[in-house]
Amino acid sequence: MKTLKLSLLSLIALTFLGFKADETPLEKLLKQLAKITATYPQEKVHIHLDKPYYTVGEDIWLKAYLVTAEKNEPSLLSTVLYVDLIDNKNSIKKKITLSVDKGIASGNISLLDSLSSGMYRIRAYTNYMRNYNQDLFFEKFIAIGSVADNKIAKKVEDKKVEFGIQFFPEGGNLIGGIRSKVGFKAVTADGLGANLSGYIVNKNKEKVAEFTAEHAGMGIFAILPQSNEQYTAIVTLADNSIKSFKLPAVLESGHALAVNSTAENLSIRISSTADLVQGKDVFVVAQVNGIVYASFTSKVDKAILTANIAKKVFPTGIVQVSLFDANSKPIAERLVFVNHNDQLKIDVTNTTEAVTKKKANLALN
């Protein structure tokens, strides 16, 4: 009987190993992604403040809502929330920790008299959120002023606007010979969007593209980068000050990922340099909040590959489209917002006439 048990266990093991061997590379990749999501769950936090601006010496009263990225449900993963008050020099001026109970936390930040007036940033995160990029931390800019004294105010001389700008090539990289869209975001030292315009030049100072910030310091332009070139952005601000910034280096070899949103589909376009057109597999995975909703394998047997994914397979939200090479290494990524206009429509009716400050009854429909 003992021998029979060993034989059965061996058979189960062999069957399991056989199943593993029959897995496609894409199936293995999806299992790896699922394991990462389970091992390092994502959380999101949103904070409500009691008002939009403050004075030195006051308290910032806040309430935080911590949810799972996967289902937007109250998170039970973290019991501590970290909240930082950061000045416009990126220096942390105050740090507090809040106890989280069933996804809810509340508290206050005392604004010491030693604080200078200006724009500050509220940043909130949990230990789990540290497993991912800090771009996923909650951030909000607030204005903090100081009480004016009775002294005669001195005339403040005009200062040049200090700002920074970041460039985001579509898919992550500029690749020689492949036309690409490049997004940009420009912010002032106060964290506000910078109103600017400019153009792109190559190393011979030849103009190859122009751009203008369209909203909150953000915009987009198209460029056909060439290998062995270095591109520079010449930027002009509203005060006519001019600065130059280097664009990311151009790669000689690589795959570029472009995703366009049409009425019904996400249109996927994979462009490859000639040296990579060898018939090897690449994998495309589309997920929302860590859940994979679509995936496929394609062979790079030509310079441009296209495919469509129906938008109806995704819930409303940000779709992360990732491109992996034959070794399951991520090589490009795009984020696209899918909106099915299925948000809750709530009408609020005040059932009592508000004459003075008092408790009021609201009807939600």
Task: Give residue spans per PLM region.
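Bacterial Sec-dependent N-terminal signal peptides
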Residues: 1-30, 364
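A structural signal for beta-strand and strand-to-loop patches characteristic of beta-rich domains
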Residues: 24-365
